[in-house]
Amino acid sequence: MSIVHFGSYTEARAHLKDLLDAAERGRVATVRRDTATTAMVDVNRLRHFLSSLIPARAEVVPEAGGWSVFIPGLPVAADGDTFDEAIAEMVDALREYADDWQDHLLDAPNHRENWGVVQLISLSDDDQLRDWLVGAAR
């Protein structure tokens, strides 16, 4: 089995197991609907790829007896009394941003290019996001 492609939604629905099996194995799995083609991808593979492609570039600085975290280029920042608290707050702030992006920011010109980081945030658990922020390999 190589590429799995179905030319219509109806055909894909009838072969959903084949699409899912192909995606889970890392094969190309696509569905065409009208003029759009959509890929099905295993979540763990996509998350791993995005985390290796998108560095967090988080900057953590001591400030006023605590710690502040921000990511240049993203409208997200967090503070905490300790380093770990600041990182935990940043995980929460990233989740809020991803929710806002999905809800109303995805078409805003100054946010639409954040698609990849929003996918990474949404596909990660809290520990994975923490590791991504501090640069730990998982």
What residues fall within each predicted segment?
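Hydrophobic pocket/interface hotspot
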Residues: 12, 69, 86
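Short, charged, surface-exposed hinge/linker loops at domain edges
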Residues: 3-4, 14, 18-56, 88-138
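Short beta-strand/loop turn elements enriched in aromatics
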Residues: 1-9
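Short aromatic-glycine-(Arg/Gly/Cys) micro-motifs in beta-strand/loop hairpins
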Residues: 54-73
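A short, exposed loop/beta-hairpin motif centered on an aromatic-Gly-Thr core
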Residues: 5, 72-84
